[in-house]
Amino acid sequence: MRLVVCLVFLASFALVCQGQGYKGPYTRPILRPYVRPVVSYNACTLSCRGITTTQARSCSTRLGRCCHVAKGYSG
């Protein structure tokens, strides 16, 4: 008898966890709002020493600054 009660409890718990047995507000996954990642302005240095031209272009595109002084990239 205990085994039957235990199996029924586990089956009902599994249905609740899947959101099929109980359609309340707490069985659904919580949707988090999309948060844009914060880009550090220190990711691209002003002197741009030691980075490739591709990285300089990426910095120019993302941050709106060009690394033309050290790399010769005019953006």
From Swiss-Prot:
It comes from the Eukaryota. One of its GO terms (biological process) is killing of cells of another organism. The modification Pyrrolidone carboxylic acid is found at Q20. The modification Serine amide is found at S74. InterPro entries: Penaeidin. Disulfide bonds join C44-C59, C48-C66. GO terms for cellular component: cytoplasm. It is found in: Cytoplasmic granule. Residues 1-19 form the signal peptide. Keywords: Amidation, Antibiotic, Antimicrobial, Chitin-binding, Disulfide bond, Fungicide, Pyrrolidone carboxylic acid, Signal. One of its GO terms (molecular function) is chitin binding. Belongs to the penaeidin family. Antibacterial and antifungal activity. Presents chitin-binding activity. This is Penaeidin-3n. It comes from Penaeus setiferus.
